[in-house]
């Protein structure tokens, strides 16, 4: 089992370097095979050296492939963890948002409870008599509850109704002041009639400017009468 040592270069750089080395060794190998045998040099020795170098490069490439596989697997796990962390972050953000909404709602409930507690303590310090409450409730019931049917109980005609009746209107202030309750009343201006102030128009006389150094020229006078009799006779 080959033991892979940690490399100083990243996997892509190591792979490119290994493939370049193998390409050079293969080119050298093909050159040796294609060249004619030289009696001065040992071709077999050179072939053995190139073969050994190719074998070492192949083993190194195998280790690089395994290392790249481990690297890709680790990167895949890293991406999964990253997505998992992103999902957890979204959940945490949602929980924090709901906690903030709950905190605001709880603060509102606490404030409302404090106000209710103050009202309760105030009512305990200053209690309202029962007679006052009953009188207030009875006065409100006339306007908030429906009238009792005559089939269930006799109707008290002297009971105050929440709406004005015809008799109460006839006994009101308008009837006492002898106001007319039928037909159209007198029409006119309410209150004393006030005359509108007259606007006085100030007329300014036209000021004629005379020039003393200007001479009178009779030929410079134009006839401005457009409807003269002379034009009709022509």
Curated annotation (Swiss-Prot):
Positions with biased composition (Basic and acidic residues): 189-217
Gene Ontology molecular functions: transcription coregulator activity
Subcellular localization(s) per the UniProt record: Nucleus
GO biological process: regulation of transcription by RNA polymerase II
InterPro entries with a match to the protein in the record: Mediator_Med4 (IPR019258)
One Pfam assignment: Med4
Keywords for this protein: Activator, Coiled coil, Nucleus, Transcription, Transcription regulation
Entry GO terms, CC: core mediator complex; mediator complex
Coiled-coil regions listed in the entry: 71-124
Region (Disordered): 188-234
Known role: Component of the Mediator complex, a coactivator involved in the regulated transcription of nearly all RNA polymerase II-dependent genes. Mediator functions as a bridge to convey information from gene-specific regulatory proteins to the basal RNA polymerase II transcription machinery. Mediator is recruited to promoters by direct interactions with regulatory proteins and serves as a scaffold for the assembly of a functional preinitiation complex with RNA polymerase II and the general transcription factors.
Record family assignment: Belongs to the Mediator complex subunit 4 family.
Subunit structure: Component of the Mediator complex.
The protein's name in its UniProt record: Mediator of RNA polymerase II transcription subunit 4
Organism in which the protein naturally occurs: Cryptococcus neoformans var. neoformans serotype D (strain JEC21 / ATCC MYA-565) (Filobasidiella neoformans)
Record gene name: MED4
């Amino acid at each position: 089992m080959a033991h892979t040592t940690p490399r100083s270069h990243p996997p892509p750089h190591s792979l490119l370097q290994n493939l370049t080395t193998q390409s050079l060794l293969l080119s050298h190998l093909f050159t040796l095979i294609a060249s004619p045998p030289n009696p001065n040099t040992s071709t077999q020795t050179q072939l053995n050296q190139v073969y050994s170098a190719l074998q070492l490069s192949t083993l190194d490439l195998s280790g690089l492939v395994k290392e790249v596989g481990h690297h890709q697997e680790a990167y895949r796990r890293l991406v999964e963890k990253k997505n998992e962390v992103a999902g957890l972050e979204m959940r945490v953000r949602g929980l924090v948002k709901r906690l903030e909404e709950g905190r605001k709602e709880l603060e509102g409930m606490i404030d409302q409870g404090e106000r209710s507690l103050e009202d309760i303590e105030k009512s305990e310090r200053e209690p309202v008599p029962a007679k006052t409450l009953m009188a207030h409730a009875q006065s409100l019931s006339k306007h908030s509850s429906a009238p009792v049917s005559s089939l269930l109980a006799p109707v008290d005609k002297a009971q105050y109704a929440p709406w004005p009746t015809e008799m109460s209107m006839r006994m009101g202030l308008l009837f006492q002041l002898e106001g007319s309750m039928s037909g159209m009343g007198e029409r006119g201006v309410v209150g004393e009639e006030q005359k509108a102030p007259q606007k006085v128009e100030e007329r300014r006389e036209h000021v004629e400017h005379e020039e003393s150094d200007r001479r009178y020229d009779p030929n410079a006078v134009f006839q401005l009468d457009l409807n003269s009799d002379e034009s009709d006779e022509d």
